[in-house]
Amino acid sequence: MLIKQYPFYLKATTILFGISLLVMMLYMLADLLVPLAFAMLLAILLNPFYSKLRNFKIPKLLAIVLTLTTLIIFITAVLYFLSSQMIQFGDTFPALKAKGAQIIIEIETWIQHTFGVSIQKQMLMLNDAANNSKGLVGQTIGSLFGLFSVLFLLPVYIFLLLLYKELILNFLYEIFSEENTNNVAEILNQTKVAIQSYVVGLLIEALIVAVLNCGALFILDVKYALLLGIIGAILNMVPYIGGIIAILLPLLIATVTKEGYSTQLGIIIAYSIIQFIDNNILVPRIVSSKVQINAMVSIIVVLLVGSLWGVSGTFLSIPMVAVLKIIFDRIEDLKPWGKLLGDEIPTQHMGQIWKRRRRNKHIVQQL
């Protein structure tokens, strides 16, 4: 209640300064915070398995090692499966390259006849674009090295988070007064449930989308249907923009391996139907219901955090907002912010309710 005694301009200035400082810190410390955020996400997800091992009287260090080993085996199995499919793709890469070169020549000829741009001028434009993209290539290579460093740090962070779980929980309880113990416990429990439910729901959604993608590509007789369907499902896990990117790969493969454009049209129709099913049935029932964040906030946060942390930020943004909503809903002064993030739409806003109260009060006074 004390914060409401300050003038509005002072509160607004303090809040804006705090937000600016927070954004600057998130951007500058991205290399540290992104792997730590992923590690916290995975540690919360792995906690039930770790707790079950502890219930069997397995020593703490051994339980953590077994938990991490299980995670590494699962990730290795998925990567092995994808790499085996990519090897088949690599075997036919020369043929795909030749077909792609032929299509490029046809496009260049069409541009020359349609727009009057000579092939030589087109090549100069492409060379300029390639020179301008050298910086982008360097950034991409840097991102790959960053990814390897994240993969190295993840097991270390997860190990430490599980090892010091009781210490961290004790700290969170001690920084608040004893009368707030129930609120802290409720926030921690709901955060754990929301993150676990969200990630599990996301994996279930990805599995269903992978089956639908592969089935559609098999029916359309697209090469590497299994690989493309699974990659599409993985990309689809990136909120809002992943599904759009996922359709480009099968379209590209169909263009260089098929004659005509009927297959490409079939891919667009099939993926549009799958996206409709995903966005209107799977996501609301399996994923969004777990975090209770409205679509407007989700899109804005995905774009904002994505601009700070890249693709990793788009994936982490929804769980981060879900945790903020849980905290806001438990603090009296921040409850309006929790309602703003939520997906419950009131039939009347508070301005209408207060206006009706004043009118009723005025009528009573007249009587």
Each language-model region and where it sits:
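Generic alpha-helical transmembrane segments of integral inner-membrane proteins
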Residues: 13-21, 25, 62-78, 148-155, ...
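Hydrophobic alpha-helical transmembrane segments
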Residues: 4-22, 83-105, 139-156, 211-220, ...
